């Protein structure tokens, strides 16, 4: 799966990039038909809810699955987005089986 990672309003370190790539590799094993994914990591102004935002747009044939989560760290936000995508993938697989 081709994964494009974008950073908005900050420069990512190597550790964060490797973390995101590792998580996306795990997600790729979960869904067989994924074409690619766009991961957008950005800083937001809202510190109460968490100012780190991770948006993942997963491209699959005929559909796009999108999850956006906030956290106090980018790792937390990415984990929450991945979990949301896993739930969406389960629903998508259920629709395909009908």
Feature locations, PLM:
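N-terminal, polar/charged subdomain of small-to-medium soluble alpha/beta proteins
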Residues: 1-98
């Amino acid at each position: 799966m081709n994964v494009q990672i974008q950073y908005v309003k900050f420069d990512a370190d190597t550790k964060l990039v490797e973390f995101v790539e590792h998580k996306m590799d795990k997600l790729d094993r979960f869904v067989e038909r994924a074409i690619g994914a766009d991961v957008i990591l950005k800083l937001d102004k809202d510190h109460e809810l968490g100012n780190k935002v991770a948006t993942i747009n997963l491209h699959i044939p005929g559909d796009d699955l999108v999850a956006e989560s906030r956290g106090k760290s980018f790792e937390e936000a990415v984990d929450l987005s991945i979990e949301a995508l896993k739930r969406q993938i389960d629903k998508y697989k259920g629709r395909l089986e009908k």
